[in-house]
C-alpha cells in the first residue's frame, strides 16, 4: 500500500469537521450573528432584570396568598372561636398563615423572574453573564471601606445596585472618591 492511500484511509477513519469557505459562512449566518453587548445595553438589561424580579415577587406573593386563603377556606377544619393555634385564636392564626404564605411566595419571585429574564433574553444571556462578572469585579475593586462611615459620611451604594447607566456609574465613582477624601480628613 502506498503512503498516500494509507493517509486517506486514516483520514476517513477519523471524523473531521467540514468548514465552508468564509464567503459562504458570512452569507449564510449574516443575520444570526449576536450583537456585542455594550455597557449601556448591559446596564439597561440589568435594570430590566431587577424590574422583572420585583414584579415576579409581587405576583408570586399575591398568588401564594390567594392559594393559602383558598386552602384555608376550603379545608374542612372545625374552626371555632374557642380553638387555639400557637396561642392564637383560629382566625388570627389563619390570617398569619396567609401572610406567611405571601411572604414565602415573594421570596420565590426573584427565582421565577430570573427564569423569565433568561427566557426573554436568551440570545444575549452568555454575553450578559460575562459583562455582569466584569461589572461586579469593577464594583468590588472600586468600592469603599465601610468601616469609616458616619452620619455625615455615609457609604455610597456599597453593592452598586442603583447604577443604571454609565452616568450613574461615573457618579458612583465620584461619590466613592469623595467618601475616601472625607475619610482621610
Curated annotation (Swiss-Prot):
Location relative to the cell: Mitochondrion inner membrane
Keywords, in A-Z order: Membrane, Mitochondrion, Mitochondrion inner membrane, Protein transport, Transit peptide, Translocation, Transmembrane, Transmembrane helix, Transport
InterPro entries the UniProt entry points to: Pam17 (IPR013875)
GO CC terms: PAM complex, Tim23 associated import motor
Span of the transit peptide along the chain: 1-29
Primary site of residence: mitochondrion
GO biological process: protein import into mitochondrial matrix
Membrane topology summary: Multi-pass membrane protein
Top-level taxon in the UniProt lineage: Eukaryota
Spans through the membrane: 52-72, 84-104
Function, as annotated: Component of the PAM complex, a complex required for the translocation of transit peptide-containing proteins from the inner membrane into the mitochondrial matrix in an ATP-dependent manner.
Assembly notes: Component of the PAM complex, at least composed of mtHsp70 (SSC1), MGE1, TIM44, PAM16, PAM17 and PAM18.
Annotated family: Belongs to the PAM17 family.
Protein name as annotated: Presequence translocated-associated motor subunit PAM17, mitochondrial
Native source species: Yarrowia lipolytica (strain CLIB 122 / E 150)
